[in-house]
Amino acid sequence: PSGLRINALGLISGMFYTSRFDKIGLFLPKYLYGRDYKKTSFAKYVNPENRELLNSLAPVWLVTSHNDFLRRYTTDFEKALTRAEREHELVDFPKHKKLTHAFSVFEPFLPESSAVIDMMVEYFRKF
């Protein structure tokens, strides 16, 4: 085991559901996990709602926005964290043409991007 202790996670516009039957899940799994991944012991961890996986997570801070094409992934994962009674916080920015997928990474000089970093740091300080 690693000596690295993770106190909290900050997840920006996450691609949590890589094997859903959607535009991403139709082609991505075989590239990420290999053609026969469903036959491996790793397969159960591809589902981010796997209870074992959820229970092993440090507190989670999530951010998305109305115009994020992966917003549903983030809000669904937040619901899974809620059902598993895991410590987490979700920030969901309202509709704005500049606040697209991972805006805080791709557009770091937006005021909202600075706010994302500030909020994430504040969350981390709790732990």
What label would you give each PLM region?
Residues 1-127:
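Alpha/beta-hydrolase superfamily serine-hydrolase fold, recognizing
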